[in-house]
């Protein structure tokens, strides 16, 4: 009799596992240690009333996710890739600039400061206290140090916690977000994995939670090396519906907010086109028949983000592990992107 052998966990995924195992504790510690810097950022935002959120990769996805949360507090917030700001810059006068970079060493970060010199209202969010960004600007520094594994997991959660500190300093109640962070969901991702097993491409989409959708699509691409991309719900509706079919998997994010009905309508349309749908659902609405629904307690904003994010991370890792032998070990990229 030949004993069945299990596939060894790839080294890259083991490294990600280590990051994820401490992301909640690091996020909580990051929030608690950020009070002083968060108060400075909040004071600047109250003075300017405008925020320019700059970052690359996963940092930009975080910025997209928190963009509506700042707007809810009356801040005119705009999130742009830092590369776009370098090439087609928005004016900086009268704005609070928040630059996010987990390493604090990205090529775009270094060039931006070299070309602009920064401003008195420029702040950073990073995981590395000794980085270029931390040395150059007043920074909120996350706990736990630099994320070593490829594909952002802990760095996303920690950066969200740093933003939560700023939002709390602006007057937002962090209680619901804390509750979601302290009690992670153990939702089984296998039904979602099964629904996506035969797809060649994944599209992620949301409305107010579009930033989370973008973070997941980036992780899926990095780990699975399959084409995965994200379209905001309205943008998906305007033309790209033509691509839908059984080989295109669609992952939707629905929160307990005013845009939930639009996400529901999109799920129905995608199913009518014959494409499998996975729904990350923090809404109070009924599940969409035919969609695989990962159901969370009703939540919106940062509470929904903290509830959904670790489950989305587990899904992207499992999706990649089924398709790539050495998932988590990059073949064309590096953890810190030092070139443009």
Model-derived regions, located:
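Residues within well-formed alpha-helices
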Residues: 62-66, 212, 216, 311
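Short glycine-/small-residue-rich flexible loop motifs, especially phosphate/cofactor-binding loops
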Residues: 67, 217-218, 267, 317
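Glycine-rich phosphate-binding loops that contact phosphosugars or nucleotide phosphates
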Residues: 46-188, 241, 249-298
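Phosphate-moiety recognition in structured ligand-binding domains
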Residues: 2-16, 137, 269-340
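Active-site phosphate/pyrophosphate-binding segments
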Residues: 12-49, 139-249, 259-260, 323-340
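Active-site-adjacent beta-strand anchor residues
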Residues: 99, 206, 305
């Amino acid at each position: 009799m030949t004993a069945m052998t299990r596939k060894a966990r790839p080294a890259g995924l083991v490294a990600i596992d280590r990051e994820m195992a401490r992301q909640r504790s690091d996020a909580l510690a990051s929030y608690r240690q950020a009070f002083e810097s968060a108060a400075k950022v909040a004071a600047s935002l109250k003075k300017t009333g405008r925020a320019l959120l700059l970052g690359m990769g996963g940092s930009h996805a975080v910025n997209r996710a928190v963009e509506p949360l700042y707007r809810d507090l009356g801040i005119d917030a705009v999130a742009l890739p830092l590369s776009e700001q370098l090439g087609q810059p928005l004016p900086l006068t009268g704005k609070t600039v928040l630059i996010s970079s987990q390493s604090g060493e990205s090529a775009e970060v270094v060039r931006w400061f070299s070309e602009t010199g920064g401003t008195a209202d420029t702040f950073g969010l990073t995981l590395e206290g000794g980085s270029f960004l931390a040395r150059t600007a007043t920074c909120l520094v996350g706990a736990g140090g630099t994320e070593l594994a490829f594909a952002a997991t802990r760095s996303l959660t920690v950066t969200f916690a740093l933003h939560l500190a700023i939002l709390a300093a602006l007057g937002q109640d962090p209680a619901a977000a804390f509750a979601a962070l302290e009690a992670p969901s153990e939702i089984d991702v296998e039904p979602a994995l099964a629904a996506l097993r035969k797809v060649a491409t994944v599209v992620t989409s949301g409305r107010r939670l579009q930033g989370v959708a973008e973070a997941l699509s980036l992780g899926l691409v990095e780990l699975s090396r399959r084409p995965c991309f994200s379209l905001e719900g309205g943008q998906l509706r305007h033309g790209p519906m033509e691509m839908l079919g059984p080989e295109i998997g669609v992952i939707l994010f629905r929160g307990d907010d005013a845009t939930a009905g639009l996400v529901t309508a999109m799920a129905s349309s995608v199913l009518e086109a014959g494409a499998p749908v996975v729904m990350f659902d923090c809404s109070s609405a009924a599940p969409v028949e035919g969609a695989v629904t990962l159901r969370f307690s009703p939540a919106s904003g940062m509470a929904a983000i903290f509830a959904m994010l670790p489950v989305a991370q587990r899904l992207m890792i499992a999706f990649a592990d089924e398709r790539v032998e050495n998932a988590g070990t990059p073949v064309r990229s590096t953890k810190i992107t030092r070139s443009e």
